């Protein structure tokens, strides 16, 4: 079952990316290093509801 999730920057809190994940394979919250246009650098982004 794939669900849509939002990735938010851990430094500024801005929600920059929307993606989907398979809850069966990844039950925990997703953490990815992505580019934040507000900070103008690569930061850690965490899954939010």
From Swiss-Prot:
GO terms for biological process: translation. InterPro entries: Ribosomal_bL33, Ribosomal_bL33_CS, Ribosomal_bL33_sf, Ribosomal_zn-bd. Keywords: Ribonucleoprotein, Ribosomal protein. GO terms for molecular function: structural constituent of ribosome. It comes from Geobacillus stearothermophilus (Bacillus stearothermophilus). Disulfide bonds: none annotated. One of its GO terms (cellular component) is ribosome. PROSITE patterns: RIBOSOMAL_L33. SUPFAM superfamilies: Zn-binding ribosomal proteins (SSF57829). Belongs to the bacterial ribosomal protein bL33 family. It holds the Pfam family Ribosomal_L33. This is Large ribosomal subunit protein bL33A.
